[in-house]
Amino acid sequence: MLDRDVGPTPMYPPSYMEPGIGRHTPYGNQTDYRIFELNKRLQNWTEQDCDNLWWDAFTTEFFEDDAMLTITFCLEDGPKRYTIGRTLIPRYFRSIFEGGATELFYVLKHPKESFHNNFVSLDCDQCTMVTQNGKPMFTQVCVEGRLYLEFMFDDMMRIKTWHFSIRQHREVVPRSILAMHAQDPQMLDQLSKNITRCGLSNSTLNYLRLCVILEPMQELMSRHKTYSLSPRDCLKTCLFQKWQRMVAPPAEPARQAPNKRRKRKMSGGSTMSSGGGNNNNSNSKKKSPASSFALSSQDVMVVGEPTLMGGEFGDEDERLITRLENTQFDAANGIDDEDSFNSSPTMGTNSPWNSKAPSSQQGKNDNPSSQSSQ
């Protein structure tokens, strides 16, 4: 038997699955259920018991220590934007009830939940803040706008960012109240007037205006509470520290060490070509045929490979490229050497290429003999 079968059925939001039905955790890190818990906690508000400690405990349960709450709306004199920190958030919710509200809750339609690295965002374009006002007269105020929340992605799921952008509001008066004062024109005229401005009571608006002064003074208040200094000394200390931050030289960016290029090394072929002939003959048997070609130092080139972001090449990108040309047809490569030419197989004893042309002196000696024979 489930617990819900014993007592009265508790209220759950539409997207929440009741405990015991395929779920082990109370709310499974659902952001909309956190809003449901916030509404349930606000329903426990009573004018006698809810003091500063109660509101501070409420804020600690649902808001992070560095939380920021932002309210934006538009009045007759232009758009307004108020941002308060964690210290001033409890008084904001308390000002709503001090303005005549007896009930406060938020209704979210089609919220969008997104997961990020360390937080979960909830974006609801159709959010309605509903307040039941008992004074100066019974009126229900519906404030429509967009609510954007950021919850820390941990077990507590507390709010770090609260941003409520108000678009419009409606004030609803029950028909029974109108029927009671149907014969009183003065009362009907009073009922036709709005009791809020853009859905916010005068108490809340005055507190938000006061927060414009209180929010920058949070540093002074914290220093006064921590060090027990006088307000004048706190102001002097804060101003001096701010002045130090302003006149401090900007931090120099870390300089990158210049890329050192490697020295070009001479190739082994060029060293061998500059040596004596004896060394060439003795090492010719040990060298491979590919290394027997003479290389000059001008054939060594450094090629820069393209790197990311258009940077220049460095030590890691340098390459030594040796260019090997076919020097067999080079006249300076010793192909005209007589000794190597005579050792060719084509220059054998019986080869017709072996007979040398008669010299000019021998031709002169043969001419007299030929004449005498005649």
Swiss-Prot record:
Biological process, per Gene Ontology: negative regulation of transcription by RNA polymerase II; nervous system development; positive regulation of transcription by RNA polymerase II
Tissues where the protein occurs: Expressed ubiquitously in the embryo and adult.
Keyword Amino-acid biosynthesis appears in the UniProt entry: no
Family that this chain belongs to: Belongs to the LDB family.
Pfam families (alphabetical): LID, LIM_bind
Single GO molecular function: LIM domain binding
Domain LIM interaction domain (LID): 299-338
Sequence intervals crossing the membrane: none
Compartment(s) where it occurs, according to its Swiss-Prot or TrEMBL record: Nucleus
Region (Disordered): 1-24, 249-297, 322-374
Name of the featured protein: LIM domain-binding protein 1-A
Gene symbol of the encoding locus: ldb1a
GO cellular component terms, A-Z: nucleus; transcription regulator complex
Keywords noted in UniProt: Nucleus
Stated role: Binds to the LIM domain of a wide variety of LIM domain-containing transcription factors.
Biased composition (Low complexity): 267-297
Main location: nucleus
Feature: compositional bias, Polar residues: 341-374
